[in-house]
């Protein structure tokens, strides 16, 4: 998936920016900004399809080949059945469809060849929206979208929903990308209003929740690439054979180095998993056949759901399933706030898996209902006394 993201992003940026190495450098910068959120999760398809969507729309706007737009409805049908953030794609497509209106409001006069045909754009938007209804829930899928949008109180409780901490270089580089995009728009003086809307929306999303930093990175490099392009320049000029060979060598070297560094094997994957999640604690539970109900740390919910499918988790990252009130109550219990010991989920639990440094781990050591069954440097397993 990471290779697919890299190839798709480079192709999209290369369509806007003359100069092979410039496009490669911009793409690499955006990918580095996204490194913290790239992983084996459904959202990776959303990132890939947003890049592909930008590439198709920008290509059609330049070439006038509207036939490519009919790739979008089936893409949205797949997207809606895979990940809820397909609405990002509808937003992108909708802004492109509204570009003539935006140009009129901002009194911007683009070249005719740089506009999507209005009828084709709106027809594609309608067809794509209808295609999203081809899912098991039909139109009700949009109620889930609204539910997620309204769950604002949980942003402080889930790490990836919090704002940037600026304790990682990717966060500072994201700011530089935004500033570079703003500079590129100002440099041209006749920047497209379309990019202003995208940059504002991406900034609001990413600076509110670090999980959306990928959208900011994609939009920013597209704005920079479009601003770098001089009018009438040959964007997709031929790339010298020497440059292609050098890129191939570098890509091969990076792949080999990554395989060596990360150790792409099942054993290495187990080591990485054990470092981030309570793998040893899970194995103890499996070996001793401990029974639930299970009370678990929220951030470990998805992992435990995968590793212990026979034990339903108390909570995981699916905020639409559990609701804000339960998540906030759960957070208070985990922090050991007053009333933690009367929580109904805790009262029903026979098994608790908690980080060793969590407040509740210290409190449970003095709770007569539970005893320590297993402990390591990462996690503590409590079992109900019989």
PLM feature segments, named:
Residues 30-34, 56, 69-84, 127-132, ...:
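Membrane-interface alpha helices of multi-pass inner-membrane proteins
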Residues 59-77, 119-123, 193-199:
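Short hydrophobic alpha-helices at membrane interfaces in multi-pass membrane enzymes
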Residues 84-189, 217:
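Transmembrane catalytic cores of multi-pass membrane glycosyltransferases
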Residues 53-69, 180-189:
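Membrane-interface transmembrane helices that cradle and orient dolichyl/undecaprenyl
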């Amino acid at each position: 998936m990471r290779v697919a993201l890299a190839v798709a992003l480079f192709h999209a940026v290369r369509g806007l920016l003359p100069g092979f190495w410039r496009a490669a450098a911009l793409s690499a910068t955006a990918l580095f900004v996204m490194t913290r959120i790239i992983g084996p999760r459904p959202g990776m398809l959303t990132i890939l399809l947003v890049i592909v969507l930008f590439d198709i729309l920008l290509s059609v706007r330049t070439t006038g080949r509207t036939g490519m737009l009919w790739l979008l409805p089936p893409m949205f049908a797949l997207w809606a059945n895979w990940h809820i953030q397909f609405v990002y794609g509808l937003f992108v497509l909708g802004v492109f469809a509204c570009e003539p209106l935006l140009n009129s409001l901002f009194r911007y006069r683009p070249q005719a060849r740089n506009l999507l045909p209005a009828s084709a754009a709106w027809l594609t938007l309608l067809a794509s929206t209808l295609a999203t209804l081809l899912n098991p829930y039909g139109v009700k899928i949009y109620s889930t979208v609204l539910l997620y949008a309204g769950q604002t109180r949980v942003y402080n409780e889930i790490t990836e929903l919090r704002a940037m901490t600026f304790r990682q270089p990717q966060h500072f580089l994201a700011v530089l990308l935004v500033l570079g995009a703003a500079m590129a728009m100002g440099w041209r003086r006749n920047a497209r209003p379309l990019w202003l809307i995208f940059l504002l929306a991406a900034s609001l999303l990413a600076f509110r929740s670090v999980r959306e930093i990928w959208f900011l990175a994609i939009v920013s490099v597209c704005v920079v690439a479009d601003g770098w392009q001089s009018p009438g320049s040959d964007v997709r000029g031929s790339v010298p054979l020497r440059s292609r060979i050098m890129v191939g060598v570098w890509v091969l070297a990076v792949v080999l180095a990554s395989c060596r560094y990360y150790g792409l094997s099942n054993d290495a994957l187990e080591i990485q998993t054990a470092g981030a999640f309570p793998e040893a604690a899970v194995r103890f539970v499996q070996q001793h056949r401990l029974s639930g109900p299970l009370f678990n740390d929220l951030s470990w919910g998805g992992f435990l759901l995968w590793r212990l499918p026979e034990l339903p988790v108390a909570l995981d990252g699916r905020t639409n399933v559990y609701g804000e009130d339960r998540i906030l109550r759960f957070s208070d219990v985990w922090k050991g706030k007053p009333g933690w010991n009367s929580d109904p989920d805790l009262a029903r639990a026979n098994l608790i898996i908690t980080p060793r440094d969590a407040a509740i781990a210290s409190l449970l050591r003095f709770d007569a209902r539970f005893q320590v069954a297993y402990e390591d440097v990462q996690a503590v397993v409590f079992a109900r006394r019989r």
